[in-house]
Amino acid sequence: MQEAPAALPTEPGPSPVPAFLGKLWALVGDPGTDHLIRWSPSGTSFLVSDQSRFAKEVLPQYFKHSNMASFVRQLNMYGFRKVVSIEQGGLLRPERDHVEFQHPSFVRGREQLLERVRRKVPALRSDDGRWRPEDLGRLLGEVQALRGVQEITEARLRELRQQNEILWREVVTLRQSHGQQHRVIGKLIQCLFGPLQTGSSGAGAKRKLSLMLDEGSSCPTPAKFNTCPLPGALLQDPYFIQSPLPETTLGLSSSHRTRGPIISDIHEDSPSPDGTRLSPSSGGRREKGLALLKEEPASPGGEGEAGLALAPNECDFCVTAPPPLSVAVVQAILEGKGNFSPEGPRNAQQPEPRGPREVPDRGTLGLDRGARSPENLLPPMLLRAPPESVEPAGPLDVLGPSHQGREWTLMDLDMELSLMQPLGPERSETELAVKGLNSPGPGKDSTLGAPLLLDVQAALGGPALSLPGALTIYSTPESRANYLGPGANPSP
């Protein structure tokens, strides 16, 4: 049995050495346990060679346990630290399994230093449950200050909410006022500029193309009779033939707006429908009234519908008559061809002009002052066949029973007119004037001597129409070809 370790000094001192430190000092200094625990060569630390054997063989002799972990925990409680050597600090496990512990007051040969080794006393916890009076007073003051700031913030928030509500009400009121002002401004603009827009659009819609292709004006109100000036160039000759522009009839619907001859009666110093006379023109020529009779072909349904229409030229009064003849018949009459059928082409030869004939009275022409209907204004040779007949009337049937069996040409109409006089140098090269028929005699009515205006479409006669010289001809802008034939002689 091993000898008991050297007894630690037991003399009374100011502080006794703890039992664990006395046992450890004896254990390290025992030469019989140097193979398991010993001093280091420097004497400032001790080494444990084999931890497992040390725990099984040595610890039970000095301590009540054989647990190495408990031994190491007690060393740590007294301030011992584990020394890590260079060999143990590497990644490879060292060959020797030993542990080294070190304390500044645990040195070999200096036993008096053991009094300095003290067990670590855990720090006493402060009593948090207790509050000092000064701390409580300070905390109460801070809480009161925070409460005052909170009350001020709540009051400010309530004020901001009230101001926000007031602003929203003002915004709603301003929006309503803004919308009302917009509506008022819109109504004012509509009242101020609405008539102008309506007048401009109505004028644009009612604006008509000029009846004469080179000069003329338009009547602003085609629904009633107006006193409008006529071009000065047109008021010096009694008879005119002109190709009208398309869509000159205003009184008929779109299905009845077809082209046809226009016969116009120009009389001098005729009073206007409202009882006023025309004022003289700017050029010094006298204003002349113009009565227009437009002939429109029958509708496809076979019924000839007539309506009041107004020519694009400005006029005193305008009357539109139903179409008395078809386009083919009028073309045949104007060209002077007798053998004409509405269905076939024109292949008849030009007949020789007949001798002079007597001028029919105004009853025959239907130009009485009291009768202003379209049928009365047209000569009997241009009157329409009865509407009951389905077949179109031929040229000979239209001319009346007195002219059956012979051809009718415009030369007969030429013989009814008086002497012709050529136009002045200011007229167009294709215009011819007639002055004979327009001069009223002592036994004539002023209506009989009034000029007539025949308006024939350019599409009826092809490139040129062979017409007698008794009629003044105006060429269309599309075709400037001479309407007069080479054999026509404008001289009387």
UniProtKB/Swiss-Prot annotation:
Keywords: DNA-binding, Isopeptide bond, Nucleus, Phosphoprotein, Stress response, Transcription, Transcription regulation, Ubl conjugation. Residues 250-286, 337-378 are annotated as: Disordered. Residues 365-390 are annotated as: Hydrophobic repeat HR-C. It comes from the Eukaryota. Its main location: nucleus. It comes from Canis lupus familiaris (Dog). Pfam families: HSF_DNA-bind. Phosphorylated mainly on serine residues. Phosphorylation on Ser-299 promotes sumoylation on Lys-294. Residues 245-323 are annotated as: Interactions with DUSP26, MAPK1 and MAPK2. Heat-shock transcription factor that specifically binds heat shock promoter elements (HSE). Required for denucleation and organelle rupture and degradation that occur during eye lens terminal differentiation, when fiber cells that compose the lens degrade all membrane-bound organelles in order to provide lens with transparency to allow the passage of light. In this process, may regulate denucleation of lens fiber cells in part by activating DNASE2B transcription. May be involved in DNA repair through the transcriptional regulation of RAD51. It is linked to Defects in HSF4 are a cause of forms of hereditary cataract (HC) in dogs. Mutations in HSF4 seem to be causing a recessive form of cataract in Staffordshire Bull terriers and Boston terriers and a dominant cataract in Australian shepherds. GO terms for cellular component: chromatin; nuclear speck. This is Heat shock factor protein 4.
